[in-house]
């Protein structure tokens, strides 16, 4: 947790440091297994949703003014400013960003100001370029291996996604809109037979890349790992 030190401007009687308002800004996001995580930096894929909290202390009778600044790497002017104590933002574009808090506390002629820019403790967010690949077949035989048709592990920064499965006559059998999802080889409550099916994926990456994947996939329910060993 970061604690920013105060600059006291136009102070009347000098107040004890312990009595001055302060902030300890944090970035909170969902980490592994969805657990709430606090950190100063993030390097991963989109969409990345984070909550930025000022965590003020000793505000007392001071009037608090907050300004969160979101800036892209290589740019000097923030592309977004927020003016609440806590703010939430979802990063949907690839690239590197800094997020910093400027907090000002005013009481009469007393002004106490905190700036992450001056302390060099701004939050850092890096969003990767997108990646999306799909296999050619799956084997929904209940052996726990390759039982669900899904995009390959390691997909990155996919911000919109829609996949559909059709049979050879063009009937839609299944649809899903989360790249973490997939088709278990069932249709209308029963098992779809072995054979060729048609996959259509429309997706978009955080880097603006469009994915339009149309291909034939094979359902091989009778295939097992023992077959590959022979």
In which residue ranges do the predicted regions lie?
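Signal that preferentially marks extracellular ectodomain short beta-strand elements
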Residues: 83-93, 107, 181-192
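Exposed beta-strand face motif in extracellular beta-rich ectodomains
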Residues: 95-99, 195-197
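Short, compositionally biased P/S/T/A/G/V-rich stretches that sit at domain boundaries
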Residues: 18-43, 129-142
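Surface-exposed, flexible coil segments in extracellular/virion-facing regions
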Residues: 60-89
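Short, solvent-exposed loop/turn segments at the edges of extracellular beta-sandwich modules
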Residues: 104-113, 204-208
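Bacterial Sec-dependent N-terminal signal peptides
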Residues: 1-23
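Short loop/turn motifs at secondary-structure boundaries
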Residues: 42, 48-56, 123-230
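Extracellular and select intracellular beta-sandwich modules with Ser/Thr-enriched
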Residues: 83, 110-121, 210-215
């Amino acid at each position: 947790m970061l604690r920013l030190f105060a600059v006291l401007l136009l102070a009347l009687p000098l107040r004890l440091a312990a009595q001055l308002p302060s902030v300890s800004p944090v970035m909170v996001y969902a980490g592994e297994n969805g657990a709430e995580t606090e950190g100063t930096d993030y390097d991963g894929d989109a969409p990345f949703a984070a909550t930025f909290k000022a965590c003020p202390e000793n505000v007392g009778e001071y009037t608090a003014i907050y300004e969160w600044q979101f800036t892209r790497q290589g740019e000097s002017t923030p592309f977004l400013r927020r003016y609440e104590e806590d703010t939430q933002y979802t990063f949907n574009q690839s690239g590197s960003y800094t997020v910093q808090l400027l907090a000002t506390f005013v009481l009469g002629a007393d002004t106490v100001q905190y700036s992450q820019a001056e302390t060099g403790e701004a939050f850092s967010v890096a969003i990767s370029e997108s990646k999306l690949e799909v296999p050619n077949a799956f084997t929904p035989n209940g052996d726990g291996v390759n039982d669900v048709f899904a995009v390959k592990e390691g997909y990155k920064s996919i911000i919109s996604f829609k996949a559909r499965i059709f049979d050879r006559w063009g009937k839609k059998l299944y649809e899903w809109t989360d790249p973490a999802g997939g088709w278990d080889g069932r249709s209308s409550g029963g098992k779809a037979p072995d054979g060729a099916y048609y996959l259509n994926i429309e997706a978009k990456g955080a880097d603006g890349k469009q994915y339009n994947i149309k291909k034939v996939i094979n359902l091989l329910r009778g295939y097992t790992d023992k077959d590959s060993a022979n």
